[in-house]
Structures are given as structure tokens and as C-alpha cells.
């Protein structure tokens, strides 16, 4: 029994060492960053969702993922904000981790997603 408990504790500890979360940012703070043009905002939703409406100025990850580096600024400290559908959606992680892999260090997650953005009655932009 002690070995089982030790094994479980080790597994939990190892899992927490590799867990990675990006700091959350509220929809109103994202809107402020969008208006000030101080961040790159990445929509990690499907192309259809992006076309239906996204945060103004947001880039579609589906459209840029194969050449992400060309879509991001040279300054690796630039604020990168990734979002997807709602707090239960994990699609944003692909975009956030891709930016992190390119060396970006200031990455945040709008966990409310486009659903929370819409609930807050913030403006959206139709996609292309």
C-alpha cells in the first residue's frame, strides 16, 4: 500500500511539473489591448467560427499556423493573446504553445473565449 501511495504521489508530482498554464486576461483587457494595438490576438477557433465573428484584429490561427513566425512581430516580449470558444475549450493551447516555441514570453489566455466576449456584448469583426 505504501508503494502504491508513493507511486501515485510521484505521478501527480511529475504531472504538475509538466503542467503549463498561461495567465488569464479578461475580455475588457483584451479590448483595451486591441484598441491600443499593443498585442497580437490569435483566434484558435475553427475557420467557420472565425468567419462568424472574432475579436477585432484577431488573426485566425488556422490560417497562419503554418507560417506563424511571419505573422508575429520580431519583439519576443510582445503581448500575445490566444483564445478559443469558452472556458472549457483547450484549442487556444496550440496557438499559445506555438508562440512560446518561437520564443515569445508574454503570452496570455482569454479563458472566457469568444463566448464570454459575446456575453460581455463586446464588438466582433466578421472574418474572411
What annotation goes with each model-predicted range?
Residues 35-36:
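Short strand-connecting beta-turns/loops that link adjacent beta-strands
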Residues 41-43:
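Structural scaffold elements adjacent to functional motifs in cytosolic proteins
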Residues 46:
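Short, glycine/acidic-enriched loop or turn micro-motifs at the edges of active sites
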Amino acid at each position: 500500500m505504501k508503494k502504491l501511495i508513493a507511486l501515485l504521489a510521484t505521478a501527480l508530482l511529475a504531472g504538475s511539473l509538466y503542467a503549463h498554464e498561461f495567465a488569464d486576461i479578461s475580455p475588457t483587457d483584451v479590448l483595451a489591448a486591441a484598441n491600443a494595438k499593443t498585442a497580437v490576438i490569435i483566434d484558435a477557433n475553427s475557420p467557420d467560427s472565425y468567419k462568424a465573428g472574432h475579436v477585432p484584429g484577431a488573426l485566425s490561427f488556422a490560417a497562419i499556423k503554418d507560417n506563424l513566425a511571419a505573422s508575429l512581430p520580431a519583439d519576443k516580449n510582445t503581448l500575445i493573446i490566444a483564445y478559443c470558444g469558452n472556458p472549457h475549450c483547450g484549442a487556444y493551447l496550440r496557438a499559445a504553445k506555438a508562440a512560446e516555441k518561437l520564443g515569445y514570453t508574454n503570452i496570455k489566455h482569454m479563458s472566457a473565449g469568444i463566448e464570454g466576449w459575446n456575453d460581455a456584448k463586446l464588438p466582433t469583426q466578421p472574418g474572411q
